[in-house]
Amino acid sequence: MSSPKPELEFVSTADPACRGSLRDVLLSAMPAKGGLWVPTRIPQVGPDFLERHRHASYADLAEAVIAPYFAEALGPAELRRLCQEAFDFPVPLVRPQGFQGSSSGRIGVLELFHGPSAAFKDFAVRTLVRVTARVLGNDFPQLTVLAATSGDTGAAVTEACAGVPGVRAVVLYPRVGVSAVQESQIARARPGVVALSVDGTFDDCQAMVKRALADESLRRRRPLLTANSINPVRLIAQVPFAFHAKRLVAPGARMGVVVPSGNLGNIGAVQLARRMGLEVAALVAATNVNSPLPELFATGQYRPRRATPTASNAMDIGDPNNLARLLAWREGGPAVSAVTVDDRQTIDAMRRVRAAGGYVLCPHSAVGWKAAEDLLATADGARLDDVVVFGTAHPAKFPDVLQEAFGDARASRFPGQLPAPAPLRIGNDFEAVRRVLESEAGF
């Protein structure tokens, strides 16, 4: 009788001696001596993996991809149940009309926004909440899920946590910079949710979350978990995106992937998929003007910056959390490139794609579309059969940008009315965050 496989461990990118189990990682989102958690080994898929799962549901494909990371901790039956619950919405690859015969006809949009919060982060946050509840729930009757958001993470967190017994979500977001739709999704009144509207930037919110996670006195009161993509569970839950994209293009096609990128978790997940053995011929981080990544790749200099508002607000991040992971998986692995797309180019891409065939991109996906066009104009891009842009959010979440692009804030709409937000307004003040975390608010 064969012995069971050992549970996969995680290691700090900053200290090879710092290791932990999945339970350890959930309880301590950041390693004690800095860095980020990454798996100690990267599982490999066989050459026939995609063919064996070509006609599987997305949930079944995702289960097969993430099983090496979670199955030993959760058990196969529990992992299957988790995937069926968390991934119960469609993930289509859409080719906007009007580009037949041009290089842009090779671009497809992988629509990752058909979950409850209408953004790609539903996949990862729903996974994280379920993994956390099943790994820690018997030992800790009360869990706090803490997140900073520039727009979409917060909505996914509140959707995933609202009404879950023993779980509360505390979400920090910048008072200026999120859209009215995003704020309504994040901060509408409901059980288990505390929304903090911060007089500061997303980077300020993120800094306060990191400070809270490192605060021993807070962590002694009750487990403090992060829903931001510094948590490796979130990133691993996004790895199936690239596998799904690959099976939706023609077998044997040379595929490039363009990822609208802010905190670098999603592009890190694609690079991890490549390290697992998935063939992606080109990978591009499509960023807005706030990202230091293109400069880092071009010059070797990393210069964080204070973010300024752009049309692609969820990517307004000047010091991305997941850089250490991306660099670790890029070193000795397939190449990753990064480009900057400004607001003028973003709005222009939205207009051109809609004018060609009626398809409406969100501003983040439009950043990706422009980067895909630029990739196809290069010598390397000319050899690609397909370029898949990750469609990260539903365009109706950004009525102000739709108004600017089309003169019509209702160019894309959600059904029904969104409720009014009811946040707690605070300054850029960690002590105010501490008071909320120490209270029973939300339970």
Q: Model-predicted segments: where are they?
A:
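PLP-dependent amino-acid enzyme catalytic core
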Residues: 2-443
